[in-house]
Amino acid sequence: PQLRHVLGTMTTNRLTGILSGTLITAAVQSSTATTVMTVSFVNAGLLTLAQAISVIMGANIGTTLTAWIMSAGFSFNITDFVWPAFFIAIILIYSKKRKIIGDFIFGISFMFLGLGTLRQTGIDMDLAHNQPVLDFFASFDPHSFQTTITFLLIGSVLTMCVQSSAAVMAITMILCSTGVLPIYQGIALVMGENIGTTVTSNVAALTANTQARRAAMAHMVFNIFGVLWILCVFRPFIHLVCGWVGFDDMMEKNDPHFVANAAKLSFVLAAFHTTFNL
């Protein structure tokens, strides 16, 4: 009864449901965890279908925070702040009154450490000078609609395989920021990630009741429709996002400002991910 009351308070209307989904996902840094929990609550009869859909919509918004954290990590070494945070967290954990805060900081620090390690691994791979990788991406026409669909499917399959849209987003940012992958293909991968991440909740709902399966399916349909309307205005929408961030998507590699311009690529991907989910 107490859990039912808490969930009911968090989802009294659509706005509070969306806000709850956003905050929970921002805290746990996993939209998959939020959607799977939501589906299980529907299966247990603790949430209605309408309440679950609002929470899932919020989860889509909350997951964009991870993209912004990762994009910021490309501007400075995020791991420099991790070790002091670990130290502070350990002190707080041994304090009875602030143990919960310490546990929270400790968990967030581990997440940042993982993101920093993933970023550094990508840099150490030196993909910008890996000829087979360069040849593979160069074989695609960046202006072709077929290429966009291909990378959308690649993004979906990769996310389904690794079960983490954040990991695929980090890989996409690394490929784009090193100049290996053009921005249009990178954004197509991000769109695919938004579809691939919905598979987990649908798998979790296979043995659930009808309402839970509908909640999981609503997540997939919602994201697929989002991708379809973006495809209709693909390039104008990207130009709009690039203009907002201040990125010149037409700049050539021999331009003296190319490196400074490429540094904004991770922010373009994060901005697109946010506007797409909003």
Please place each PLM-identified region on the residue numbering.
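Transmembrane alpha-helical segments and their short flanking loops
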Residues: 115, 122-123, 127-142, 206-278
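Alpha-helical transmembrane segments of multipass membrane proteins
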Residues: 66, 162, 166, 197-200, ...
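Signature of multi-pass transmembrane helix bundles
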Residues: 50-58, 64, 68-119, 128, ...
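Interfacial helix-loop-helix linkers and transmembrane-helix boundary segments
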Residues: 1-9, 49, 97-104, 208-218
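Helix-loop-helix hairpins and the membrane-proximal interhelical loops
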Residues: 1-14, 18, 105-157, 175
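Hydrophobic core segments of alpha-helical transmembrane domains in multi-pass membrane transport
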Residues: 21-25, 85-95, 107-118, 152-159, ...
